[in-house]
């Protein structure tokens, strides 16, 4: 004769307090990000906008727009950095590849001109006056 307890009845709770037959984790609800078709968190973006006190009031479309812009910029940057790492036959994106991606792209370089990426290095560049002349 065994002393194990039978499984809880349908709709009951198990020992940990969770409902029986229901998986823990994400339920696949209809959050703002899912409605907008974004990966970046719209709700968190809105909370940070309000907590930052950038304005007295924040419209309901502002977090969606900001999350979309942030998602686009990070996707663009990761794509360019991934291309740079692939060109150098590496499988990992390092700060060096992020720097190469930003500085070789005209628009990103203009946008991030005042940004220093830690451990990123600089673009390789040798001035023409320092090179030896071929005629002599």
UniProtKB/Swiss-Prot annotation:
A GO cellular component annotation in the UniProt record: nucleosome
Ranges where the record places region Disordered: 1-38
Compartment list: Nucleus; Chromosome
Keywords assigned by UniProt, alphabetized: Chromosome, DNA-binding, Nucleosome core, Nucleus
Disulfide feature: none
UniProt cross-references to PROSITE patterns, sorted A to Z: HISTONE_H2A
Transmembrane portions of the chain: none
Domain of life: Eukaryota
Keyword DNA-binding: yes
Keyword Nucleus: yes
UniProt xrefs under Pfam families: Histone, Histone_H2A_C
SMART domains linked: H2A
Molecular function in Gene Ontology: DNA binding; protein heterodimerization activity; structural constituent of chromatin
Function: Core component of nucleosome. Nucleosomes wrap and compact DNA into chromatin, limiting DNA accessibility to the cellular machineries which require DNA as a template. Histones thereby play a central role in transcription regulation, DNA repair, DNA replication and chromosomal stability. DNA accessibility is regulated via a complex set of post-translational modifications of histones, also called histone code, and nucleosome remodeling.
Quaternary structure note: The nucleosome is a histone octamer containing two molecules each of H2A, H2B, H3 and H4 assembled in one H3-H4 heterotetramer and two H2A-H2B heterodimers. The octamer wraps approximately 147 bp of DNA.
Family: Belongs to the histone H2A family.
Protein name: Histone H2A
Source organism (scientific name): Euglena gracilis
């Amino acid at each position: 004769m065994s002393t194990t307890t039978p499984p809880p009845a349908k709709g009951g709770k198990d020992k940990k307090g969770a409902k029986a037959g229901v998986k823990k984790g994400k339920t696949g609800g209809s959050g703002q990000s899912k409605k907008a078709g974004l990966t970046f968190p719209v709700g968190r973006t809105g909370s940070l906008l309000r907590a930052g006190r950038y304005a007295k009031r924040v419209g309901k479309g502002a977090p969606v727009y900001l999350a979309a812009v942030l998602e686009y910029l990070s996707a663009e940057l990761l794509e360019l950095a991934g291309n740079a790492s692939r060109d150098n036959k590496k499988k990992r994106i390092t700060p060096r590849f992020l720097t190469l991606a930003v500085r070789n792209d005209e628009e990103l370089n203009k946008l991030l001109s005042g940004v220093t990426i830690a451990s990123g290095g600089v673009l390789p560049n040798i001035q023409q006056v320092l090179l030896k002349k071929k005629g002599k």
